[in-house]
Amino acid sequence: MPQLVESCGIFFFCFILYCLCFSLPLQKIKIVIMRVLIVNTSERAGGAAVAANRLMDALNNNGVKAKMLVRDKVSDDITVVGVQRSLRSQWNFLWERWCIFWHLHFSRKNLFGIDIANIGFDITSLPEFKEADVIHLHWINQGMLSLKNIRKIINSGKPVVWTMHDMWPASSICHLTLGCHHYTNGC
């Protein structure tokens, strides 16, 4: 008989606990959704853009709110946001290319194989950046982000993930090293 009372007591306790847990109003349950901002120069052009789009789709289909911030927006996709390009930003891009062209002694051979990242957009003041929990950098060259902008993103305190689609993040100048290892001790 004492075992029956004890069993009934445990059952009653579990029943009360069950009722309390499942009778809570839904307004008191807060679900937090992670927000990821994927940053890439182009929305569609290049392998990095393809990878960034696939990642964004996978995240959005699995309970994460992901947006992509690009310099070159071509679609009307609402999850892709283009930075505001101005005449000045286009001039800055051309000026950076001219400096590289001059340094290469007017050879077009490696004009787009090198990036000095002197110019770019400050994305830290954008609402998409402020809302994001995680910043994921992809291919961010040719006027998307400068070295100064990258430092500002890192100093924002948000976690930063950087997918290296080429050697630029390691070499700080060349997209492809082509057997050259000068970046390891100075170029």
What are these regions (language model features)?
Residues 1-10:
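Intrinsically disordered, low-complexity segments enriched in serine/proline and basic residues
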Residues 5-6, 28, 130, 162:
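A generic alpha-helix propensity feature with a strong bias for hydrophobic helices
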Residues 34-187:
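Catalytic cores of nucleotide-sugar-dependent glycosyltransferases that transfer UDP/GDP/TDP-activated
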